[in-house]
Amino acid sequence: MKDTYRHQGKRQQLVKTVKKKGITDEKVLGAIGNIPRHLFMDSSFEDHAYQDKAFPIAADQTISQPYTVAFQSELLEIKKGEKVLEVGTGSGYQTAVLCLLGAKVYSIERQRELYKKTKSFLSKLGYRPKYLSFGDGYKGIPEYAPYDKIIVTAGAPEVPRDLLSQLKVGGRLVIPVGTDVQTMTLFIRKSAKEFDKNEFGAFRFVPLLEDKN
């Protein structure tokens, strides 16, 4: 697992790319510039790891486009020490970004193969989420709720009610909503029953899988 000067140079180019696309949060840009994305991908994609593109990983999932990771992270407005629920651990790349932003990360993954692989991999790289769970993302992780922030890294036709209920008052939930194409949506909890909703452009995500059993 090598991270060379060449990789680091390509990462700085990637930072410039996402900056040009409108990302301004210096902490988020710092995380993108710091995390060895090529190590989160199949070695056959290594040469392309710092292109601003999504790539396939195990279990028919993808590692999100860096701009998308940065965009969602910026919308969350994470402060150090906040409890963040991540729905869809995936490759662990977004998890690593959240860890570097100082969040206490609680992450859930539906695909067992991916969950096992990513769990051992993150600790090898030195990223320490508070809790990684295998289970149904639609249900969140209620035993550690409420959360300051919630990020969903797969598309859902609508926001799962269980996730809204696990958000603190004043908290922010970022989720791509839609079926074929998703609209990035930010919910801010104003009170026990009231949420503000803001929409930010079209994105494409793999679907959030629900456990039908």
Curated annotation (Swiss-Prot):
EC number(s) reported in the record: 2.1.1.77
Compartments in which it is found: Cytoplasm
Keywords, comma-separated and alphabetical: Cytoplasm, Methyltransferase, S-adenosyl-L-methionine, Transferase
Pfam entry (one): PCMT
Active site (UniProt): S64
Catalytic activity: [protein]-L-isoaspartate + S-adenosyl-L-methionine = [protein]-L-isoaspartate alpha-methyl ester + S-adenosyl-L-homocysteine
GO MF term (any one): protein-L-isoaspartate (D-aspartate) O-methyltransferase activity
Main location: cytoplasm
Any one Gene Ontology BP term: methylation
Gene Ontology CC terms: cytoplasm
Stated role: Catalyzes the methyl esterification of L-isoaspartyl residues in peptides and proteins that result from spontaneous decomposition of normal L-aspartyl and L-asparaginyl residues. It plays a role in the repair and/or degradation of damaged proteins.
PANTHER family, per the entry: PROTEIN-L-ISOASPARTATE O-METHYLTRANSFERASE (PTHR11579), PROTEIN-L-ISOASPARTATE(D-ASPARTATE) O-METHYLTRANSFERASE (PTHR11579:SF0)
Protein name stated in the entry: Protein-L-isoaspartate O-methyltransferase
Gene name in the database record: pcm
